[in-house]
From Swiss-Prot:
Species of provenance: Methanococcus aeolicus (strain ATCC BAA-1280 / DSM 17508 / OCM 812 / Nankai-3)
Keywords: Amino-acid biosynthesis, Aromatic amino acid biosynthesis, Glycosyltransferase, Magnesium, Metal-binding, Transferase, Tryptophan biosynthesis
Annotated metabolic or biological route of this protein: Amino-acid biosynthesis; L-tryptophan biosynthesis; L-tryptophan from chorismate: step 2/5
MF (Gene Ontology): anthranilate phosphoribosyltransferase activity; magnesium ion binding
Cofactor mode of binding and number, as noted: Binds 2 magnesium ions per monomer.
Protein's UniProt name: Anthranilate phosphoribosyltransferase
UniProt gene name: trpD
Amino-acid positions noted as binding Mg(2+) 2 in the UniProt annotation, renumbered to this chain: 216-217
Function per UniProt: Catalyzes the transfer of the phosphoribosyl group of 5-phosphorylribose-1-pyrophosphate (PRPP) to anthranilate to yield N-(5'-phosphoribosyl)-anthranilate (PRA).
The protein's assembly and partners: Homodimer.
Amino acid sequence: MLNKIINREDLSYEESYDLFNDLLNESEIKIGAYLSALQTKGFTANEIAGFAKAMRDNAIAIDLGKGISDTCGTGGDGYSTINISTAVSIILSCFTKVAKHGNVSITSKSGSANVLDALNIKKDCNPEEAKKMIDKTNFVFLFAPNYHPALKKIMPVRKELGIKTIFNILGPLANPANPDYQIMGVNSLDLVEKVGDALKLLGVKKALVVYGNGLDELNPNDYSTICEINENEENKIYKIHPKDIGLTPSNPIPCNSPDESAKRIIKIFSGTINEDRDFILLNAAAALYASNIAKDYKEGLKLAKEVIDNGTVLKKLKEIQKYGE
């Protein structure tokens, strides 16, 4: 199969699934060769989905029920902003169950796991604890290294290679809770359609894949490109601007640490009105739409504003924090 990839021939979904399983038992040299060859060829939706399904199937089993949402993005956009996906996941948990799958930061100064630590939110739940936490609070964080022990052999090779590989985009697609709804940020335009097609193959009910013209979130100051996935429908690609849903464009404020990110999220949840609020609201509106809570982005914005302004989301944050004490 390595020669096939080197010859720039695409793998089928089934071949990709089998290759992932084979890599778990290969030598480090072979793993490095396959990952490098795939990266050079460029991967397809079938290859992404095949790897992601195999990664899910090799994960620690967890059953959190149906109707779960996730807000994980690829990261790696090179910008240091507050952790939008974490803030959005807490807002979303005011309406539905959220199992946020994530890891410590690779390029950002405030990755999800880092910010959850700063917020004093429990992040090391085993499957039994995760079920109890999500049933009690509507929120749980699934720390990726705890749920993907099969990757222990592959991770050092990725680090040694020092290049981007298919694994850079697999994390958000490999949530072991198999979410029905998802908003997923990607860090390049060419991934929007591919990842959308991969999510369709993975059987998601509804999802949005977003690229914010340089950001792996919806951009608060520019157009964002979106792939909308609905089961039993063709995927749709379109652009959206903050003004389209009634927000004034604003530049995201840089963030220097997880602690700063946590403090700024709490400020917004406490009623502070500034650029951070608009950035969070824009992405929360999309998440509520992606999770079938809101009928469109404008209704999503209205709902997100309401739970911030009436104190519901701050109360939810305290409830989630208290659970881990």
